[in-house]
Amino acid sequence: MIITTTEQVPGYRVKEILGVVCGNVVMSKHLGKDIAAAFKTLAGGEIKGYTEMLTEARNIALERMIKEAEKLGADAVIGFRYSSSTIMSGAAEILAYGTAVKLEKI
């Protein structure tokens, strides 16, 4: 499966647009880690627990999007993007989305 942020894939042409595909996940940190993160914001610096949580969430959302594209028989997802939003304190939604397409080699 080819995943690209561009609208075209070098060496291929889009034969068929199958539709928008997406994958999302909402994740939160453990309360104890959330309290530790609050103290970290006072001192400054990277909050590693949240960085790890968001990295994991992006990977899960991407895998879910790929599964949706595979169900449609896609060769690629073009125009790929991530979006994130805060659901509540310590919880975030990550959305991976793009356009599932069939490709033809040129």
UniProtKB/Swiss-Prot annotation:
Domain of life of the source: Bacteria
InterPro entries the record matches: UPF0145_dom_sf (IPR035439), UPF0145_YbjQ-like (IPR002765)
Pfam family, one: YbjQ_1
Gene3D superfamilies: Hypothetical protein apc22750. Chain B
Family the UniProt entry places it in: Belongs to the UPF0145 family.
Protein name: UPF0145 protein Tpet_0165
Origin species: Thermotoga petrophila (strain ATCC BAA-488 / DSM 13995 / JCM 10881 / RKU-1)
